[in-house]
Amino acid sequence: MIKGRFPHMFKPRVYITRQIFPDALDLIEKSADLELWPEDEPPSPEQLREAMADVDGAIINVMDRIDAPLLDAAPKLKVLSQVAAGLDNIDVPEATKREILVGYTPGVLAKSTADLAFGLLLAVARRVVESDKWVREGNWKISHHPMFWL
């Protein structure tokens, strides 16, 4: 045996609570045995506790509440990774007390939020919603003047 190294005789078990990109699944599957929640709706707290009872890690979503009762039901859990910018749904002090590593994706939505904000600003400034409704109602046949929709 080489000192300081441990041969991996098994892959850690990882539970994923939502669909993620196939490329990410392929990458994770190279080093872990995966179990993926198959539904679009989130698992109930009971389903989540049951699924995490024998896993080493989990990739979760902001809709999954990770609290002391869930952590009690997941004695092997060593790492949690949240696919979200915040940690409001995770009892981080409790996870830390149990030496469970917690990761998340801060800033992941910053550009998308900025894009949406500018889109909404343009929609309001150019009256896009009102114009869309007007056209859908068949009013586009009516003549307009230079001050129209200003």
What are these regions (language model features)?
Residues 98-100, 106-150:
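Phosphate-binding beta-alpha-beta segment of Rossmann-like dinucleotide-binding domains, i.e.
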Residues 4-105:
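An N-terminal-biased, well-structured beta-alpha scaffold segment characteristic
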